[in-house]
Amino acid sequence: MSLSAKDKATVKDFFGKMSTRSDDIGAEALSRLVAVYPQTKSYFAHWKSASPGSAPVRKHGITIMGGVYDAVGKIDDLKAGLLSLSELHAFMLRVDPVNFKLLAHCMLVCMSMVFPEEFTPQVHVAVDKFLAQLALALCEKYR
């Protein structure tokens, strides 16, 4: 499932609109991830609190959205653009790749809640495809 030129334009446009609330979306998406999929808390055992809405979860959610925005800027070559993040997650953090898909789903839910009018079916498809390609790029070094 590759991204067409129209998909890329749609993603860039939507993320431009979303920039004012991206921190909130990142924090809420990660909060939902640890609440709905509690096994993901194991990656954050070193935090004082990995509870939904806690300060460390919010901070890391913001960091994640920063990475997603970086990926939007590298949308034409995600695998090459995200190679260092792939290495980090594969070799140092040892994140199970399935978690990228789970987080992507939580992001979609949050985006649709915060931007119900802008999150049209066309935007949904384009952003879903983008997040799937992003997850695939992050898995590059797992092979």
From Swiss-Prot:
Residues annotated as binding O2: 60
Molecular function as annotated in GO: haptoglobin binding; heme binding; iron ion binding; organic acid binding; oxygen binding; oxygen carrier activity; peroxidase activity
Residues reported in the UniProt entry to bind heme b: 89
Functional note: Involved in oxygen transport from gills to the various peripheral tissues.
InterPro entries associated with the record: Globin (IPR000971), Globin-like_sf (IPR009050), Globin/Proto (IPR012292), Hemoglobin_a-typ (IPR002338), Hemoglobin_oxygen_transport (IPR050056), Hemoglobin_pi (IPR002339)
Description of how the protein assembles with itself and partners: Hb 1 is a heterotetramer of two alpha-1 and two beta-1 chains.
Stated name of the protein: Hemoglobin subunit alpha-1
